[in-house]
């Protein structure tokens, strides 16, 4: 009798994706982040669903409803902080996943990579709208500042902003539609993740060496299921430690003040995972230029496959490219730090230099270094 997992229409999809999938024998723990992102998404959808049962998307009651969740709902505080810190874990895994793709040349799988970039945009949009929902001071200011950026679009800008707001300022209509979008987007992300996986399984996984692993494959189960479970346990350990010991560490104290249009907080800043892009936005003294730089800071990922000039796929055997890669990582950490600082003397110039370095590394220095390495290796 043939095994049901290989014949049943539904089971055979699961079987070919997670059980009998031929995987390279040498993929390291950097390949764990795909499954961790899946776990993060499931955690976010489940906790979000339970939060939505108690949340009200009305400007008069939104802040109170979040307080009610934390005070009166059984384990509401736990659900709320799992959701808030789960978003941080989601972005940590995302950044590491993208960094892995850059380092090992996974971007050569064009369809998989482009859907990944689309997923990154979708997750960022979802996180931004989620931050608006508690209707604290920083929620309100963030919504106003970020939506206002669209007014930099020539001719249609101001009309577009009012259309998104549903009025002449960020108000009840804005909050209601943000809640609707915040609810639906994770399901779109889940569908996109399925397509992401579909395209990945067309080619098979990359591996640290960047060479073809067709001659040396092992089944996904039990080898990588066990390996992924270890990663998931570590993720849950870090997330629960964060939630139970310092749930507000990554948040902003201003968001515990109800939104007040008449009172502006001294420093408006987004959540930590947007600070690098926010620093790039602020480093350009022109509104339209800043908005373009902000979008390009993420969109630049889509053109990375076109900038691949090396004859080797991975950076594993390319020490000069490795140096530039880690310089890029350091630069992104610097930008994240600058994004959280006030706009005054030393920080402005540091932010501008870090922004220039960010684009220079990706668009100019890394492709040139790859060409140089080709010559050094007589390729």
UniProtKB/Swiss-Prot annotation:
Q: Where in the cell is it found?
A: Mitochondrion inner membrane
Q: Where does heme b b562 bind?
A: 83, 182
At which positions is a ubiquinone bound? 201
Q: Which CDD domains match?
A: cytochrome_b_C (cd00290), Cytochrome_b_N (cd00284)
GO BP annotations, alphabetical order: mitochondrial electron transport, ubiquinol to cytochrome c
SUPFAM superfamilies, A to Z: a domain/subunit of cytochrome bc1 complex (Ubiquinol-cytochrome c reductase), Transmembrane di-heme cytochromes
Cofactor(s) required for function per UniProt = heme b
GO molecular function per UniProt: metal ion binding; ubiquinol-cytochrome-c reductase activity
Output a single Gene Ontology CC term carried by this record.
respiratory chain complex III
Q: Which InterPro entries match?
A: Cyt_b/b6_C, Cyt_b/b6_C_sf, Cyt_b/b6_N, Cytb/b6-like_sf, Cytochrome_b, Cytochrome_b_C_euk/bac, Cytochrome_b_N_euk/bac, Di-haem_cyt_TM
Q: Give me the segments passing through the membrane.
A: 33-53, 77-98, 113-133, 178-198, 226-246, 288-308, 320-340, 347-367
Cross-referenced PROSITE patterns: CYTB_CTER (PS51003), CYTB_NTER (PS51002)
Instruction: List UniProt keywords, sorted A-Z.
Output: Electron transport, Heme, Iron, Membrane, Metal-binding, Mitochondrion, Mitochondrion inner membrane, Respiratory chain, Transmembrane, Transmembrane helix, Transport, Ubiquinone
Keyword match Amino-acid biosynthesis: no
Q: How does it sit in the membrane?
A: Multi-pass membrane protein
In terms of one coarse class, where is the protein primarily found?
A: mitochondrion
Write out the similarity annotation. Answer: Belongs to the cytochrome b family.
Further facts: Heme 1 (or BL or b562) is low-potential and absorbs at about 562 nm, and heme 2 (or BH or b566) is high-potential and absorbs at about 566 nm.
Assembly behavior: The cytochrome bc1 complex contains 11 subunits: 3 respiratory subunits (MT-CYB, CYC1 and UQCRFS1), 2 core proteins (UQCRC1 and UQCRC2) and 6 low-molecular weight proteins (UQCRH/QCR6, UQCRB/QCR7, UQCRQ/QCR8, UQCR10/QCR9, UQCR11/QCR10 and a cleavage product of UQCRFS1). This cytochrome bc1 complex then forms a dimer.
Summary of the function given for this chain in its UniProt record: Component of the ubiquinol-cytochrome c reductase complex (complex III or cytochrome b-c1 complex) that is part of the mitochondrial respiratory chain. The b-c1 complex mediates electron transfer from ubiquinol to cytochrome c. Contributes to the generation of a proton gradient across the mitochondrial membrane that is then used for ATP synthesis.
Protein name listed in UniProt: Cytochrome b
């Amino acid at each position: 009798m043939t095994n049901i997992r290989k014949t049943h229409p539904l089971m055979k999809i699961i079987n070919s994706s997670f059980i009998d999938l031929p995987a390279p024998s040498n993929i390291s723990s950097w390949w764990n982040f795909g499954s961790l992102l899946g776990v993060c998404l499931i955690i976010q959808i489940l906790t979000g669903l339970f939060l939505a049962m108690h949340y009200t998307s009305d400007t008069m009651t939104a802040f109170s409803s979040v307080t009610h969740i934390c005070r009166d709902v059984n384990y509401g505080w736990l659900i709320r902080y799992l959701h808030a810190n789960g978003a941080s874990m989601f972005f940590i895994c995302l950044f590491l996943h993208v960094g892995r793709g850059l380092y090992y040349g996974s971007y050569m799988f064009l369809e998989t990579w482009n859907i990944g970039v689309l997923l990154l945009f979708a997750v960022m949009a979802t996180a931004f709208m989620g931050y608006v929902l508690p209707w604290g001071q920083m929620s309100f200011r963030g919504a106003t500042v970020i939506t206002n950026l669209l007014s930099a679009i020539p001719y249609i800008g101001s009309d577009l902003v009012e259309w998104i707001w549903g009025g002449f300022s960020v108000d009840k209509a804005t909050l209601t539609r943000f809640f609707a979008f915040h609810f639906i987007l994770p399901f779109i992300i889940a569908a996109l993740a399925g397509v992401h996986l579909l395209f990945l399984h067309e080619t098979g996984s990359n591996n640290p060496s960047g060479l073809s692993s067709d001659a040396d494959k092992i089944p996904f189960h039990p080898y990588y299921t066990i390996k992924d479970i270890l990663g998931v346990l570590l993720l849950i350990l870090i997330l629960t430690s964060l939630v139970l010991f310092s749930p507000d560490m990554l948040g902003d104290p201003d968001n515990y003040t109800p939104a007040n249009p008449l009172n502006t907080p001294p420093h408006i800043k987004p959540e930590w995972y947007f600070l690098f892009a926010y620093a790039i936005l602020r480093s350009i003294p022109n509104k339209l230029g800043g908005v373009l730089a902000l979008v390009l800071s993420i969109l630049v990922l889509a053109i990375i496959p076109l900038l691949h000039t090396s004859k080797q796929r991975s950076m594993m055997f390319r020490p000069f490219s490795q140096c530039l890669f880690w310089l890029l990582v350091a630069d992104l950490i610097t930008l994240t730090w600058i994004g959280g600082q006030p706009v005054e003397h030393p920080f402005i110039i540091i932010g501008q230099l870090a922004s220039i370095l960010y684009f220079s590394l990706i668009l100019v220095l890394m492709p040139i270094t790859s060409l140089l390495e080709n010559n050094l290796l007589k390729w």
